C-alpha cells in the first residue's frame, strides 16, 4: 500500500507484508484453525489493496501554527497509542480520500465549525452519495446550522452535527446505495448510525457467494440478525417467503425501507431478539410483535445467521440444528469454531469461504454452508 503512514499508523497492523502475503497468512491461519472440521478447499474473496473503505472515522487534532493560529488535522493512533496526525488515508474510498482535505480546509477557515470539533465520520456509497457527521464538545447553535449548510452545498455532501444530547440532521440521515449483485441491481439506504459493511466490493462478493451456493427453494428462509437487509433482500429471490429478525430498532427501520426500495413483498421483518424468536417458534410463549404473523404459515428449510462477534448462544445453536440448510456468516473465527463444534454434530460443511474485508489487519470474515447429515 502506497501510504505515507503505513507502518506508523496502528490501523494497519500487518504493514510488514505485501497484500498477498498478509492474505496468505490469514488463509493458512484459518485453515489450520478449522482443520478438525473440514479439508475442503476454501473459497477466497480478496479485497482491493487500497481505497476499499466506504466508512471511516477520524479524530480531529488541534495545535498552534504560525501567528498562534489554530491548525486542524485528522488524527489516528500510532503503535504506542500516541496521537498521529494525518492528512490522508489510503484505506478509504477515492471519494472519501478526495473529500478529506477539502473538508478540513473548510472547517479550518471557520471558527464556528471548527471550535471544539473532536471527530469526523464519513459514510459513502459507490453512487457518490456522502454523509459526514461532525462531532463536537459544545452545544450547536443556529449559527452552526447556517455555516454547515453552506459547506453541504459547496462540497455536495450531507452533514449531521452531533453533540451531547444533540443530533442535528441538515438534509437527511442516510445515503443511497445501488449494489449490482449477480447482474441485478439492489437498492439500499444506509443510515448514519446503522451498521453497514465498510468494504463495498467485498460485500457484493460475499452476497454473490451466498447466492451462488444457495439453491432455489419452494420453501421459506429464516434469518437471525438480519441488520438492514443486506443479505435478506438479495436472498429473498431464492425462497418463497422470508422471516427475518433483528433486535436493533434502527436496523429494522432500514430493513423496511430497503425492502420498499426494492419492491419486495415476500419478506417479513420482526424486531425481536434471536432468543425470543426461538421461544416464539417453539411456542413457549406468545409475543405481541408477532400478532400479525402466523408462524404456522412458514415451511422453513434454510436458516441464515450473521451474528455479532459473540456468535450464537445455546438456544440459537439448537434452533439451527433443526434446519436442512445452515448459512453462517461470521466476523469472529474463534466463536465460529466454537459454534461449529455443535453444528457439525448434525450437519456437514459443504462450502467454506474467507472474506478479506479489512486488508492489512488480522481480521478476516468467514462464510460456512452446512447441510443436514442423512440418517
Swiss-Prot record:
Transmembrane segments: none
Top-rank lineage group of the source organism: Bacteria
Catalytic residues (UniProt): 331 (nucleophile), 365 (proton acceptor)
Binding residue positions for S-adenosyl-L-methionine: 197, 225, 230, 246, 306
Keywords per UniProt: Methyltransferase, S-adenosyl-L-methionine, Transferase, tRNA processing
An example Gene Ontology CC term for this record: cytosol
Pfam families tied to this protein: tRNA_U5-meth_tr
UniProt cross-references to SUPFAM superfamilies, sorted A to Z: S-adenosyl-L-methionine-dependent methyltransferases
Reactions mediated catalytically: uridine(54) in tRNA + S-adenosyl-L-methionine = 5-methyluridine(54) in tRNA + S-adenosyl-L-homocysteine + H(+); uridine(341) in tmRNA + S-adenosyl-L-methionine = 5-methyluridine(341) in tmRNA + S-adenosyl-L-homocysteine + H(+)
One of the GO biological process terms: tRNA processing
Record InterPro entries: MeTrfase_TrmA_AS, SAM-dependent_MTases_sf, TrmA_MeTrfase, U5_MeTrfase_fam
A molecular-function term among this protein's GO annotations: rRNA binding
Coiled coil residues, start to end: none
EC number assigned by the record: 2.1.1.-, 2.1.1.35
NCBIfam families in the record: trmA_only
PANTHER family from the UniProt entry: TRNA/TMRNA (URACIL-C(5))-METHYLTRANSFERASE (PTHR47790), TRNA_TMRNA (URACIL-C(5))-METHYLTRANSFERASE (PTHR47790:SF2)
This protein's name: tRNA/tmRNA (uracil-C(5))-methyltransferase
Underlying gene: trmA
Amino acid at each position: 500500500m502506497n501510504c505515507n503512514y503505513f507502518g506508523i499508523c496502528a490501523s494497519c497492523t500487518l504493514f510488514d507484508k505485501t497484500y498477498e502475503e498478509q492474505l496468505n497468512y490469514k488463509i493458512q491461519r484459518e485453515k489450520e484453525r478449522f482443520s478438525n472440521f473440514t479439508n475442503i478447499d476454501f473459497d477466497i474473496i480478496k479485497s482491493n489493496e487500497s481505497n476499499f473503505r466506504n466508512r471511516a472515522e477520524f479524530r480531529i487534532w488541534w495545535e498552534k501554527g504560525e501567528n498562534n493560529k489554530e491548525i486542524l488535522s485528522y488524527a489516528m493512533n500510532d503503535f504506542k497509542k500516541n496521537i498521529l496526525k494525518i492528512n490522508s488515508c489510503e484505506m478509504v474510498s477515492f471519494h472519501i480520500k478526495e473529500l478529506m482535505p477539502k473538508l478540513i480546509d473548510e472547517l479550518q477557515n471557520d471558527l464556528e465549525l471548527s471550535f471544539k470539533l473532536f471527530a469526523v465520520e464519513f459514510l459513502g456509497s459507490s453512487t457518490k452519495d456522502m454523509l459526514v457527521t461532525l462531532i463536537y464538545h459544545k452545544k450547536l447553535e443556529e449559527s452552526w446550522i447556517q455555516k454547515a449548510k453552506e459547506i453541504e452545498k459547496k462540497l455536495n455532501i450531507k452533514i449531521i452535527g452531533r453533540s451531547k444530547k444533540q443530533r442535528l440532521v441538515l438534509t437527511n440521515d442516510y445515503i443511497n446505495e445501488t449494489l449490482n449483485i449477480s447482474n441485478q441491481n439492489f437498492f439500499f439506504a444506509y443510515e448514519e448510525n446503522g451498521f453497514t459493511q465498510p468494504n463495498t466490493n467485498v460485500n457484493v462478493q460475499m452476497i454473490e457467494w451466498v447466492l451462488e451456493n444457495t439453491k432455489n427453494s419452494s420453501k421459506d428462509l429464516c434469518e437471525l440478525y438480519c441488520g438492514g437487509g443486506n443479505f435478506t433482500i438479495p436472498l429473498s429471490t431464492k425462497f418463497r417467503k422470508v422471516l427475518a429478525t433483528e433486535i436493533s430498532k434502527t436496523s429494522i427501520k432500514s430493513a423496511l425501507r430497503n425492502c420498499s426500495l426494492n419492491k419486495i413483498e415476500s419478506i417479513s421483518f420482526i424486531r425481536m431478539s434471536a432468543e425470543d424468536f426461538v421461544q416464539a417458534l417453539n411456542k413457549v410463549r406468545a409475543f405481541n410483535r408477532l400478532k400479525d404473523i402466523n408462524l404456522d404459515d412458514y415451511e422453513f428449510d434454510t436458516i441464515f445467521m450473521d451474528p455479532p462477534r459473540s456468535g450464537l448462544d445455546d438456544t440459537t445453536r439448537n434452533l439451527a440444528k433443526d434446519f436442512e440448510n445452515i448459512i453462517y456468516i461470521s466476523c469472529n473465527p474463534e466463536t465460529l469454531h466454537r459454534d461449529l463444534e455443535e453444528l457439525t454434530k448434525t450437519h456437514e460443511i459443504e462450502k467454506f469461504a474467507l472474506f478479506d474485508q479489512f486488508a492489512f489487519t488480522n481480521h478476516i470474515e468467514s462464510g460456512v454452508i452446512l447441510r443436514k447429515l442423512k440418517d
